[in-house]
Amino acid sequence: MNEPTVENGKLVRRNESGTLTQVALIYSPGYGGGFSSWDTKYPGCIYCPELALGILNGGTNLHEIVERLFPGLYADWESGLRVEWVELGKPYYLHEYDGSEWIVTDFPIA
């Protein structure tokens, strides 16, 4: 798998032959206010490439990134953000319970 790149406003990965295969999704597994699910002002924050790269690179500047890109964000993101790589074109669901989020990709489609 090649290094992630930003394409069409999302952080993505390509396989060795150059085919686009995965997209990065950001979520907050801690309880409180779900990062990608609670604030309706920033519905696309789940795909933010700059924040996803910050998380993948150790998270040392996440506070600055979130404050700059999402001022006034209503979410409990400081308890920890995670990136999950999802296969391109695969349906997913961002599940949330009491602010704790997780990505579900294995579910029946009727």
Predicted regions and their residues:
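Catalytic phosphate/metal-binding cores of nucleic-acid and nucleotide-processing enzymes, i.e., regions
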Residues: 2-110
